[in-house]
């Protein structure tokens, strides 16, 4: 959960020029201080992309195999058909060019124990738009409770093929294999999970200060329920996961690094770009307003991904490197994606839902030399991650704050 105060866009200390001319007609009537509609804000600075790098490490296959032998494997389609929660919306979200939305059940809508962050869809997984024959949305939540037990990250599996407006869903707990091959176990994944990206059988989860955690849907396990405080292998040989019925294991990690004196990139969000060649991953970082005011850079990068093994793709020298990088200096960026060379950024504006100027903003720019264009109050309060569905031209996002947790899509081409 992150907060942002409304103020003029910080201009980079490198001397980015502010462009104050209007660039579009307002789409709704708002207070003069927060006039809606697109407006050109500031230029974007290209960076040396190859200075952003990754190193792959994998969970020992023998350990994953031992858990495969100990636990029943199930398919994503099985989990999607096993939804145990039904959403209910009390109102519709105010979203510019809105095309779809749904909610959570009352417990998930109001809880302060978990906060939703990342979103990805089966249109990321496969270009057909379905996985196991179903349209599925995945949303990550991080444990926000102060109960002495850090349960890590859970992922909501929503079955939109069953109902587009009220998809039944179930939470799956992310876990990291541990123990030995003779006594295999697992533990929670204690990260913020600010971004989520699904590619084939792999689920990429943003690890703020570490790069990406990767989870394999070919190893989706059913575990015992009935104990809300137990995790992993128990003394009687049973396996539990805080009363969640299914767990998804981490099978790989991409640890990030930099060269050329660049500061480490915060991995605050991640999305897939299927409109690039090859397919690629878009990563952006969150910086608070005070950090930007103090001169912190805010950057976004593009990294190619290989459709054959679903891993980030190395360059010809064998090193995994970004191929595009930009400095935007946008404060409070919560999500990003790219569509046909145009970048999109969601920006949160605090949690005061009674103030329409607390609604999230959407920013765009056309790479490589376009200026940032602000679409004021286009998203909901607490706007988070972004994901693009090219099969329907849906730009998905979601809200994080209790009581205002819509999951919604807008018509991407309208921005």
What is the predicted function of each stretch?
Residues 2, 6-107, 411-415:
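Sequence/structural signature of beta-propeller modules
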Residues 66-112, 167-187, 227-264, 311-329, ...:
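Surface-exposed loop and turn segments in beta-propeller and other repeat-based domains
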Residues 109-133, 189-199, 261-280, 329, ...:
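Structural signature of eukaryotic scaffold interfaces centered on beta-propeller domains
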Residues 124, 135, 280-384, 391, ...:
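Loop/turn-rich, solvent-exposed surfaces of beta-rich toroidal or solenoidal domains
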Residues 138-139, 204-206, 283, 345, ...:
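Conserved beta-strand element within WD40/beta-propeller blades
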Residues 173-177, 184-195, 201-302, 331:
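Eukaryote-skewed repeat-based solenoidal scaffolds used as protein-protein interaction platforms
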């Amino acid at each position: 959960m992150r907060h942002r105060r409304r103020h003029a866009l910080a201009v980079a200390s490198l001397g980015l020029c502010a462009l104050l001319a209007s660039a579009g007609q307002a789409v709704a009537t708002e207070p003069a201080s927060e006039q809606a509609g697109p407006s050109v804000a500031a230029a974007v600075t290209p960076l040396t992309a190859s200075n952003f790098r990754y190193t792959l490490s994998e969970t020992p296959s023998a350990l994953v195999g031992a858990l495969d032998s100990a636990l029943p494997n199930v398919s994503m389609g099985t989990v999607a058909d096993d939804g145990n929660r039904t959403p209910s919306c009390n109102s519709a979200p105010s979203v510019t060019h809105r095309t779809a939305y749904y909610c959570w059940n009352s417990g998930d809508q109001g809880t302060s124990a978990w906060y939703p962050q990342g979103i990805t869809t089966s249109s990321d997984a496969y270009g057909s738009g379905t996985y196991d024959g179903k349209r599925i949305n995945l949303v990550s939540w991080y444990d926000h409770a102060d109960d002495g037990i850090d349960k890590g990250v859970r992922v909501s599996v929503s079955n939109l093929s069953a109902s587009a407006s009220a998809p039944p869903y179930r939470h799956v707990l992310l876990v990291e294999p541990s123990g030995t091959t003779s006594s295999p176990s697992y533990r929670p994944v204690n990260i913020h999970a600010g971004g989520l990206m699904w590619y084939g059988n792999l689920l990429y989860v943003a690890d703020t200060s570490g790069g990406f955690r990767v989870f394999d849907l070919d190893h989706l396990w059913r575990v015992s329920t009935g104990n809300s405080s137990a995790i992993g292998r128990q003394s009687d040989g049973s396996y539990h996961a805080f009363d969640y019925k299914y767990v998804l294991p981490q099978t790989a990690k991409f640890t990030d690094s930099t060269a050329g004196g660049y500061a480490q990139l915060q991995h605050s969000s991640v999305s897939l770009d299927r409109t690039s060649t090859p397919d690629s991953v878009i990563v952006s970082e969150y910086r608070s307003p005070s950090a930007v005011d103090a001169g912190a850079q805010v950057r976004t990068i593009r990294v190619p991904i290989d459709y054959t093994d679903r891993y980030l793709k190395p360059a010809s020298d064998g090193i995994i490197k970004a191929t595009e990088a930009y400095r935007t200096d946008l404060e409070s960026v919560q999500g990003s994606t790219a569509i046909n060379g145009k970048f999109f950024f969601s920006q949160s504006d605090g949690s005061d839902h009674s103030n329409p100027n607390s609604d999230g903003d959407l920013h765009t720019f056309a790479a490589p030399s376009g200026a940032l264009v602000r679409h004021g109050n286009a998203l909901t309060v607490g706007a988070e991650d972004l994901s693009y569905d090219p099969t329907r031209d849906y730009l998905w996002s979601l809200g994080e704050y209790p009581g205002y947790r819509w999951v919604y899509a807008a018509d991407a081409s309208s921005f």
